[in-house]
């Protein structure tokens, strides 16, 4: 608590506290319970009604039923032994099972996180405050939007809401995993509270902002469980390509008997089924859903809640990131560093009016002005009775201050805004005002002009600090081909100094909320995808306009509703990690698609020569792998085709290693590793399986 002396009386002002990000809560990929449940779900997903959602694996399951029939009724298959049909049937079953297991494992990790969130969702009693002041206790599940609720120290906040009265410390660890409490108070951008969190000091009155079942925690549980997950546009497009390839191979395999009959020999149905399954892209088909689910899970592990997979994918395609200066690029704790009187005014006069404009200002800047004035020993003699109405800062006016009961008005704020305010009252502007303001700006500070009536008394020098490592992070984004833009309400000189120090590509000075929307639209008109962060109600329109809008959990309900991602740690710089995760998701999908198609090329060289060697002896020259026999070649390729899916599950879950580099370098690297590797690995794998299979085939 800090005392502010006003003519011998004390006004207590609570100091704010800033928490650091908590450790990320996550479920291990191979947790025993998750794996056990994934096995059960993989079996349940064998239901054709479930399998039809994945057309590629549905084709494999149809093949399983065909070979199962051939195994049960051997007379339908006369060209191959019964053991071959049974083996093919089992391998196809495991192929489908492994694909289902990958998806169930990814979903299981989300469900484990959802279970921990459900533990925070308890039906407690709430103290409803009626219009006449009477307090009634009801179950939290009976609260409706608009209800006023009193929450005291030690009580759980019964539902989502906004603080309308009071100030308190709130423990949000049940939601964010961060143990340090955060301050919540009426007004401003930090009035939003979440149901399931607990008040640890003082008391607050909140207005409920959601009906039962519509709270933030309810939405989190649904999203983390994947109940609302839909396929993203990129996923749908890739699925369309894979289905097209499957249809092409299906037509080729169905018409193949016409060709073999012409050559004078017949191919058994089970061999045709095995050939089809080996040629269609089953690897990526079996892992595609798991990759998408795991991508959202990786975002969740960073304590970021993505409203859809589309938002995560969009983050991977981002071209421009728009960042607020305060709290994102800089620490955001601009503190009063000096007082500079202008014209013929004295520093004592400036100190008096600076303090008067800040005595009821609960912002960090306002409190720092009071601290500075008191630390320098300045005094002012204003009775508490003379203090009138506080004028809060607004983005439109860019000023705050107080209207005294005597009729005098005092303001502090952006130099340009205060000049306009003074000139509107026919006041004169000191000749050295701009010179001193420019001096502060060139040093990277922020000048706030102080005026009373139609006189400007001087400047408050606010100083902020760029967060360490920001220049390096922006350089990484530049290597990824992403442009960074800084938006700030500071004047152009201050903005330019901070931008140069931080290493951002462009900046927008004296930026108002509507300016952010204009900047976003301008970038989008150039065909670029834009990401931005925000926490205030005035950020909501821009968050909605951006392709990726990351809202802070500590921000207002309007900001969180407008955004498509919410950072539970309220760390604006996390947008950079979100972009990296999005790119990793797209790269993982692309790399495994490349690997899957390259696999098909290798399997082609394993199966086709073996199938036609009997009828066309010259095909033996293409049997470069030296496989044991035609049946061994087909089984080896089919077994490898099944085993590669579980072998790639950890990579699909974790994502491929990502380092910032140019698109061309990235493409060459992935083609080399996953294209060439996708051809080489099957040659080695199929040969090893053939050596084992050959031991059982005479």
Swiss-Prot record:
The system is composed of three essential subunits: KdpA, KdpB and KdpC. This is Potassium-transporting ATPase ATP-binding subunit. The active site is at residue 324. It catalyses: K(+)(out) + ATP + H2O = K(+)(in) + ADP + phosphate + H(+). The gene is kdpB. Its main location: membrane. Mg(2+) binds at residues 535, 539. It is a multi-pass membrane protein.
């Amino acid at each position: 608590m800090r005392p502010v002396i006003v003519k011998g009386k004390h006004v207590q002002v609570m100091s704010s506290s800033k928490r650091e990000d908590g450790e990320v809560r996550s479920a291990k990929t191979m947790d025993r319970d998750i794996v056990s449940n994934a096995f059960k779900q993989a079996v349940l997903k064998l239901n054709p009604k479930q399998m039809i959602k994945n057309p590629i694996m549905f084709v494999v399951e149809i093949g399983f039923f065909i070979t199962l029939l051939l195994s049960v009724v051997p007379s339908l298959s006369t060209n191959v032994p019964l053991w071959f049909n049974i083996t093919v049937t089992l391998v196809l079953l495991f192929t489908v099972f492994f694909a289902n297991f990958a998806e169930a494992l990814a979903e299981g990790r989300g469900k484990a996180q959802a279970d921990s969130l459900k533990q925070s969702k308890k039906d407690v009693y709430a103290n409803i405050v009626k219009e006449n002041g009477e307090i009634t206790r009801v179950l939290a599940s009976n609260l409706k939007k608009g209800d006023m609720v009193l929450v005291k120290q030690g009580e759980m906040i019964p539902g989502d809401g906004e603080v309308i009265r009071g100030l308190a410390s709130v423990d949000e660890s049940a939601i964010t995993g961060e143990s340090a409490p955060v301050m919540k108070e009426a007004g401003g951008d930090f009035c939003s509270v979440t149901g399931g969190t607990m008040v640890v000091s003082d008391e607050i009155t909140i207005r409920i902002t959601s009906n039962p079942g519509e709270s933030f925690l309810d939405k989190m549980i649904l999203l983390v469980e994947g109940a609302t997950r839909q396929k993203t546009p990129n996923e749908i497009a890739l699925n369309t390509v894979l289905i097209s390839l499957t249809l092409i191979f299906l037509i080729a395999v169905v018409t193949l008997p016409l060709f073999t009959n012409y050559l004078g020999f017949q191919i058994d149905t089970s061999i045709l089924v095995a050939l089809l399954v080996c040629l269609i892209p089953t690897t990526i088909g079996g892992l595609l859903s798991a990759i998408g689910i795991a991508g959202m899970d990786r975002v969740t592990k960073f304590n970021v809640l993505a409203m859809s997979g589309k938002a995560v994918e969009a983050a991977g395609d981002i071209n421009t990131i728009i960042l607020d200066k305060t709290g994102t690029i800089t620490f955001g704790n601009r503190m009063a560093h000096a007082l500079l009187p202008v014209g013929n005014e004295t520093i004592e006069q400036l100190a008096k009016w600076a303090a008067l404009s800040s005595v009821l200002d609960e912002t960090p800047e306002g409190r720092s002005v009071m601290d500075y004035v008191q630390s320098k020993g300045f005094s002012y003699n204003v009775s508490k009775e003379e203090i009138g109405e506080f004028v809060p800062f607004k983005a439109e006016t860019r000023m705050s201050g107080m209207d005294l009961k005597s009729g005098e008005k005092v303001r502090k704020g952006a130099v340009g805004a205060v000049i306009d305010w003074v000139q509107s009252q026919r006041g004169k502007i000191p000749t050295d005002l701009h010179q001193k303001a420019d001096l502060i700006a060139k040093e990277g500070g922020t000048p706030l002009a102080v005026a009373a009536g139609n006189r400007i008394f001087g400047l408050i020098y606010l100083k902020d600090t760029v967060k360490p490592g920001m220049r390096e992070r922006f350089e990484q984004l530049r290597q990824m081909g992403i442009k960074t833009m800084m938006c700030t309400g500071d004047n152009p000189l201050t903005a330019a100094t901070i931008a140069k120090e931080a290493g951002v590509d462009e900046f927008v000075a004296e930026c108002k909320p509507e300016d952010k929307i204009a900047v976003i639209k301008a970038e989008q008109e150039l065909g670029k995808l834009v990401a931005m962060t925000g926490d205030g109600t005035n950020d909501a329109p821009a968050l909605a306009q951006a392709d990726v809008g990351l809202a802070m959990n500590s921000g207002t309900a309007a900001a969180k509703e407008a955004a498509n991602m919410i950072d539970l740690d309220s760390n604006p710089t996390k947008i950079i990690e979100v972009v990296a995760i999005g790119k990793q998701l797209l790269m993982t999908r692309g790399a495994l698609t490349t690997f899957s198609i390259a696999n098909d090329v290798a399997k082609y060289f394993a199966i086709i020569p073996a199938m036609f060697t009997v009828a066309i002896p010259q095909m033996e020259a293409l049997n470069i792998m030296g496989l044991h026999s035609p049946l061994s070649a087909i089984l080896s390729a089919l077994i490898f085709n099944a085993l590669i899916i579980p072998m790639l599950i950890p990579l699909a879950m974790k994502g491929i290693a990502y380092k910032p580099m140019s698109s061309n370098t990235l493409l060459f690297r992935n083609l080399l590793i996953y294209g060439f590797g996708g051809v080489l690995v099957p040659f080695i794998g199929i040969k090893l399986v053939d050596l084992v299979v050959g031991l059982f085939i005479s």
